[in-house]
Amino acid sequence: MTGTESRAEIGALGEQLAVDYLQGLGLRVLARNWRCRYGELDVIAADGRAVVFIEVKTRTTDRFGGVAQAVTPTKVRRLRRLAGVWLAQQPGHWAAVRIDVVTVRIGRRRVPEVTHIKGVA
């Protein structure tokens, strides 16, 4: 990072790093930045027969809190609603549904720090 990146550029970088991490775990990305009138889902992936809705949070500092503060109860409710809308539009059915959070900490470190919390909702 050069220090001149916009919030959008930092967010896009964090999301790409998260997708790379998830694919490295064997998840298959179905959609990125899926939008409807209620909001946006960052990443939708398949983990075997489970569909996973992933909220990606990118941080350059701890000023806004760490992983524990990344997703509030209000955000979880919104993610559940969005997941329901996406699922209602799908022709098939999934054996399981999961909501995960991936935080990416980038900044002065050479290697970004990725934290993956499975099943937050």
Swiss-Prot record:
GO terms for molecular function: nucleic acid binding. It comes from Mycolicibacterium vanbaalenii (strain DSM 7251 / JCM 13017 / BCRC 16820 / KCTC 9966 / NRRL B-24157 / PYR-1). This is UPF0102 protein Mvan_2202. HAMAP family: UPF0102. It comes from the Bacteria. NCBIfam families: PRK12497.1-3 (NF009150), PRK12497.3-1 (NF009153), PRK12497.3-3 (NF009154), YraN family protein (TIGR00252). Belongs to the UPF0102 family.
